[in-house]
A protein has these predicted regions:
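Short beta-strand scaffold segments in enzyme catalytic cores
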Residues: 54-60
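Zinc-dependent deaminase
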Residues: 1-46, 112-115, 119-182
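A structural microfeature
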Residues: 67-68
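A short, polar/charged loop-to-alpha-helix boundary motif
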Residues: 76-86
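Glycine-rich oxoanion-binding loops at beta->alpha junctions
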Residues: 86-93
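Short, basic and Ser/Thr-rich N-terminal targeting/leader segments
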Residues: 50-54, 102
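Glycine-biased flexible loop/turn sites that connect beta-strands or occur in inter-domain linkers
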Residues: 63-64
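Immediate flanking context of iron-sulfur cluster ligation sites
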Residues: 98-110
């Protein structure tokens, strides 16, 4: 176990075999479903550009009005922080003229990583909806619980598994093609 993982385990941020119960998770709404459709379109566009196929949309929770969107752009920008969630949250903050996004929902095709989960907390995003779990880097539920950790100054409610199979299939196909040299 690495020092960092050991520290995270002591802080209770590492999942140990059995996932914790998501008691705060509400069901997906029609706005979530519409945003996920768009996030999947964005993810397909990322794949066509040779990027890992992840798409994200931020919308105003009460109205469903879209405020920002993004897809992975790490390769084309040579920017390790150019994740779909970062792009969507930045665009939403610019659109509303405020970094506080309590009134917003982030919909993303893949469970956010630690960097993106930290941004979710710092931007105070109210809800997060994601499709596929990420057992290797997921920081909302799979490996860590950063987005709803009660010790942090903000917690987002989570909805998981929306269009799970579509999101996971897109990733599987992308990495299969990459391994086969396509």
């Amino acid at each position: 176990m690495t020092i960092a993982r050991s520290l995270l385990a002591r802080l209770g941020l590492v999942r140990r075999g059995v996932p914790r119960d998501d008691t705060l998770t509400p069901d997906a709404t029609k706005h979530d479903r519409r945003a996920m459709d768009r996030a999947l379109e964005l993810a397909r566009g990322a794949a066509a550009r040779g990027e890992v196929p992840v798409g994200a949309v931020v919308y105003e929770t009460a109205t469903g009005h879209p405020l920002g969107e993004g897809s992975n752009a790490r390769e084309e920008r040579s920017d390790p922080a150019a994740h779909a969630e970062v792009e969507a949250i930045r665009a939403a903050a610019r659109a509303v003229g405020d970094w506080r996004l309590n009134h917003c929902t982030l919909v993303v095709t893949l469970e956010p990583c630690a960097m993106c989960a930290g941004l979710i907390v710092n931007a105070r995003v109210g809800r997060v909806v994601y499709g596929a779990d990420d057992p290797k880097a997921g920081a909302c539920r799979s490996l860590y619980r950063l987005a709803d950790d009660p010790r942090l100054n903000h917690r987002a409610s989570l909805v998981t598994g929306l269009e799970r199979e579509s999101c996971a299939a897109l990733l599987r196909e992308f990495f299969r093609a990459r391994r086969n040299g396509s």
